[in-house]
């Protein structure tokens, strides 16, 4: 046999890197387990490599991770390599929601910031013996200041798409082959995602954690491989258009369900005094010169039950680290409140609280609640009068209690999926009125929720 050494070119070097990457993943399979994993890896949602599929994660699955994205696969606004990170939750067996941030340079400063987007997937048809599963989904559908997803104007929506996709799996001798076919709905002319897409995945019977995939994403052909590591981690890499390599890593967790417990706790009189240590981590993406404003605090608190229905909380906030300016640099008061519960006719009850609250407010608050005997329905009224409570330049500064706020709320409890549905009409601190809807689900020791609100002519979610 004769072997001729090829000329070393940039293209050959890219192919060499691709082969080395895939080989590394192959070697790492000695530490994987047998649990399966599915996701549209590049966007942090369920699917193949760069296309969605109609597969869904197990109910309650939480995923978080990050991806390396070469400039060849990014929209035209990116002229450089970038990446994204995401959180994803299978909120219901047929519903998946993801929040994603893609790193983006600000043209005016050259500093890194991020583009934020949301993905939503709904499965109207689950896979059966003779038919495929079907999913209808969207990526980056809405944008700031524009609620009409069909308009080209307003916002960025770099990754916008609406699609319908079907997936069918075929098994033989323990092997699994998945076939996916779908198409993008042409809902706006400036969308980067158009046309038909499809792909094939293969899981060998002798190595279930390994998945090999090939796809056409409506523009180019991609080939890649993924592997499940240590029960909770997934690593993947793929060749985009046979020109460059993309890849990523994510963590997955499926918590156990738990039974409901009342969210309105009636405080007994037992004289208990507790010292509780609260870690505080805050991330805020509101600046063009940094990716996040970050705050890390330790906030110890004394919590005491005084007499029947009465409670006291005294908290101090100790700053650990932050990249902000203002009161975040100072040791300051946290929650300092005294509350008293009282019973009302018909099984209703109330609570009045006075003191220093969160969100830099100080004042008085009154809550009235009534729950049906089976705890399925809860009705509530709330009102308060507050002023500002801030700590600048080493001084605690408070204002007069002039701001009036309030709310009327109703909650319905759905027991099959351990869910609460809340509807509230609110008057906010600065006098604006709004409506808010919350959908909350309880997983194990974790509670997750989705909300939508409308106030002042603007909507948020």
Task: State the predicted function of each range.
Residues 143-144, 172, 222, 358, ...:
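Short beta-strands and strand-coil junctions in structured, solvent-facing domains, enriched
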Residues 41-43, 232-236, 240-277, 390, ...:
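Flexible, glycine-rich linker and terminal segments associated
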Residues 153-217, 312, 344-347, 359, ...:
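Detector for outer-membrane/organellar transmembrane beta-barrel domains
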Residues 254-303, 308-361, 365-402, 407-411, ...:
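Gram-negative and organellar
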Residues 60-62, 83-85, 116-120, 160-164, ...:
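Hydrophobic, lipid-facing positions within transmembrane beta-strands of outer-membrane proteins
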Residues 1-43, 254-266:
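Cleavable N-terminal export/targeting peptides
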Residues 66-68, 99-101, 134-140, 179-185, ...:
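Transmembrane beta-barrel strands of outer-membrane/channel proteins
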Residues 39-162, 170-171, 175, 204-210, ...:
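Transmembrane beta-barrel domains of Gram-negative outer membranes and organellar outer membranes
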């Amino acid at each position: 046999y004769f072997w001729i050494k090829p000329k070393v070119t940039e293209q050959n070097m890219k192919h060499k890197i691709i082969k080395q990457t895939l080989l590394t993943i192959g070697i790492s399979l000695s530490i994987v387990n047998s649990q399966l994993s599915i996701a549209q890896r590049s966007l942090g949602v369920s699917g193949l490599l760069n296309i969605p599929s109609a597969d869904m994660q197990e109910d309650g699955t939480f995923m978080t991770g990050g991806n390396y994205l070469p400039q060849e696969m990014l929209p035209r606004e990116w002229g450089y390599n970038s990446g994204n990170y995401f959180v994803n939750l299978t909120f219901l067996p047929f519903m998946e929601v993801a929040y994603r941030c893609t790193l983006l340079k600000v043209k005016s400063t050259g500093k890194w910031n991020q583009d934020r987007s949301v993905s939503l997937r709904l499965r109207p048809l689950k896979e059966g013996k003779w038919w495929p599963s079907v999913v209808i989904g969207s990526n980056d559908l809405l944008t700031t200041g524009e609620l009409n997803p069909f308009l080209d104007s307003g916002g960025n929506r770099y990754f916008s798409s609406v699609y319908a996709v079907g997936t069918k799996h075929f098994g033989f001798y323990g092997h699994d082959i998945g076939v996916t076919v779908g198409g993008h709905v042409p809902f706006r002319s400036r969308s980067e995602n158009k046309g038909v897409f499809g792909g094939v995945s293969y899981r060998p019977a002798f190595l279930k954690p390994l998945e090999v995939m090939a796809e056409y994403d409506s523009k180019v052909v991609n080939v890649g491989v993924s592997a499940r590591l240590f029960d909770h981690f997934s690593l993947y890499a793929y060749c985009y258009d046979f020109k460059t390599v993309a890849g990523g890593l994510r963590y997955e967790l499926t918590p156990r369900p738990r039974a409901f417990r009342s969210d309105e706790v009636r405080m007994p009189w037992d004289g208990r005094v507790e010292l509780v240590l609260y870690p505080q981590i805050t991330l805020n993406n509101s600046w063009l010169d940094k990716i996040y404003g970050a705050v890390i605090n330790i906030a110890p608190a004394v919590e005491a039950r005084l007499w029947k229905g009465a409670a006291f909380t005294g908290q101090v906030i100790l700053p650990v680290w932050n990249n902000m300016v203002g009161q975040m640099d100072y040791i300051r008061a946290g929650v300092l409140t005294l509350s008293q519960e009282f019973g009302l006719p018909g099984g209703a009850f109330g609570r009045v609280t006075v003191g220093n609250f969160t969100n830099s407010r100080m004042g008085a608050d009154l809550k009235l609640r009534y729950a049906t005997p089976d705890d399925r329905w809860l009705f509530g009224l709330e009102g308060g009068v507050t002023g500002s409570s801030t700590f600048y330049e080493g001084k605690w500064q408070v204002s007069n209690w002039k701001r009036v706020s309030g709310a009327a709320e109703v909650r319905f409890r759905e027991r099959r999926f351990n869910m609460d549905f809340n509807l509230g009409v609110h008057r906010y601190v600065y006098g604006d009125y709004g409506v808010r809807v919350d959908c909350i689900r309880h997983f194990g020791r974790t509670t997750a929720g989705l909300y939508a609100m409308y106030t002042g002519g603007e909507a948020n979610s």
